[in-house]
Structure formats: structure tokens, C-alpha cells
Amino acid sequence: MTMQTRVARIHEYGDFDVIRIETDALPDPGPGEVILKQGAAAIHFADSYMRQGRYFLKPPLPTVLGLEGVGTIAAVGDGVADYTEGDRAAYLFNVGAYADARVVPAEALYVPPVDLDDATVVAAFVRTMTAQYLLRQLYPVASGETILVHSAAGGMGSLLTQWATSLGAKVVGTVSSPDKFLTAEENGCAHVIDYTKEDFADQVLDITGGAGVPVVYDAVGADAYEGNLRALAPRGWFVNYGHASGPPPIDALELNQKSLIFTKASMKDCVATPEEKAAMMEEVVAVIADGTVKLNITGRYELACIGEAHAALDSRTTTGALVTVFED
């Protein structure tokens, strides 16, 4: 009997209401592939960007959204040696995760820690891997530094704040509403700024005695651009990893005024070799296991409600991580 799967698909780019829940016949796995019956899939800002046509990956339409999932292998194609039916497996950066079952290349899989449930796996790994290359590779944060982290109560901002604090940095965090202050403080922020009510750059300069910060971690994008330039110290690093309000309007002449360095990195270039990926995964597993980073899952959505999750993301009112969970 042919296996059926429900998916969240878009046929056009647009707002959250372009997402359609559809039922597909699932093909048999081909050589080097498996069928994964999923327990959970991550809901990332990248999924929203893809839905809007603003992500660097633009698979042909129509397409199933989602990049990260975990579940149990239901069938194995020819030539797959490392996995068998019944194994638990997860994957990163493979388009099509919003599905209760799907075909996945075996080479994209990894074995998640046994002590993490499905929702925690998809809430943890891409976000913590991103935090690793932002904090440990692009600009290695040092003890005693004062740094700026935007969206300090959100899924990524929370991890950046927690990890940077554990490294000895003093984090100035921005949030979009007063009800996010407590979350940002619990994450470790020494100072919290509501950027909708205060000029965050003025506040940062006041906190640092006019010196500015050596690095800003930004996923806001256009709306925070001018303030980031003012908040940075000379030769500071402007690390952008998202653009919730649109891409930052980078101007080389403006960067030149203070010899600023702008970077927007991709994880693929930070795990370009098996050795780099193994080293990153080792550190990521360690900081999750020892509690350096704590995953706060604030929204669990059934597949049929995935549009509601995207609406929440787009409104920039969320804290913590969002996941979609699938029925057994």
C-alpha cells in the first residue's frame, strides 16, 4: 500500500495565508534514501523568509517548507548502510520538513542524543550550531567584553545571550516589548532595552561610556541598521544573521567611517569539512548537555496550524523556539 503524507506547501510567495495543507502519495525511497516518519520539525525564521521568497534558497514552486526534522526511519532504500528501519534519525537543512513523513537522503541524517525528545532536538541543533559559529568562529567573544544582542528574548537571541554570558561577556540585549524583559534578563542580559521606546544606540553608548561595543549580533536587519552603526566601536564587527525587517542597506562608505566589519555568514562555510562539522557538533552537544544553553520551547503547533506559527513569527511577538509536532 502506498504511504500517504500530509505536507504544508506553498504554490506562491506571500503572507502566512499562502500555506496549504495537502496530502501526497509518498514514493518509495530511492537508492541512498530513507523514509522518515517524523515526530517534530523546526519552525525557523528562515522558513518565513522562504515563504516570502526572501531566503537565499529558492526551490521551485510549489514547494514544501521546512528545513529541519526528526523521527523514525520507516523504510530504507538500496545502498543505505548506516541506518535501518526503526532507527531514530534527524537532519538539518533539507527542504521539505513540514511533512508527517518524507523522503530524506541518508547522507543528510545524523543520530540525535537519546536523552533529548523530538521537539527539543529540532529546537536545539540548528539554533545552537548557529550560535556556535557566530560566537566562537566569526567573532570569538572574550570574557569582559560588553556586546549587543538584538532580539534577546527570541529563539536565537536567547541562545546567544546565554552562551555569551557563560563566556564572561556582559550582554546588552534589545527586545520589542516590555513583556520580554524578564525573559531577556533570565537569559543573562546585564542590560535590557525596549528598542520600540528607547534609542538603543544611545543607551549602548551610555552603558559603555561612549566607547561602543566591539560586536553586535543582529537579526532585525533594516530597522536596526543605523543604530547598529552608531552603537559599534571603531573596528567593530556587525554580525548579521537575519533580516526580520528586511535586509540591512549596507553602504561601504558608512562602514568606512569607523572601519567597521560587516559579515553575513552561512553555516555551510563554517562546517565545510567533516572535521569542522564534527568539532562543531561536539561543542554543541556539550553546551546543551551541561546546561550552558537552555532551550525554551514556547510554541508547539500541529501541522494544520503551521500558518498560525508563521503569523506569530512575522509579528515578531514570539519568545523562545517554535516547533511543529506530528501525531503518532
Where in the sequence are the language-model features?
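NAD(P)H dinucleotide-binding glycine-rich loop of Rossmann-like/cofactor-binding domains
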Residues: 49, 88-153
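A glycine-/small-residue-rich N-terminal strand-loop-strand element
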Residues: 37, 50-51, 70-94, 170
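C-terminal hydrophobic helical "lid"/dimerization subdomain
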Residues: 2-3, 275-328
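N-terminal glycine-rich beta->alpha transition that marks the start or flank
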Residues: 3, 15-18, 24-70
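Glycine-rich phosphate-binding loop and adjacent beta-alpha segment
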Residues: 175, 223-293, 325-328
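NAD(P)H cofactor-binding loop motif with strongest signal on the N-terminal glycine-rich segment
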Residues: 151-152, 220, 243
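Mid-domain Rossmann-like dinucleotide-binding core that forms the NAD(H)/NADP(H) cofactor-binding site
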Residues: 122-197
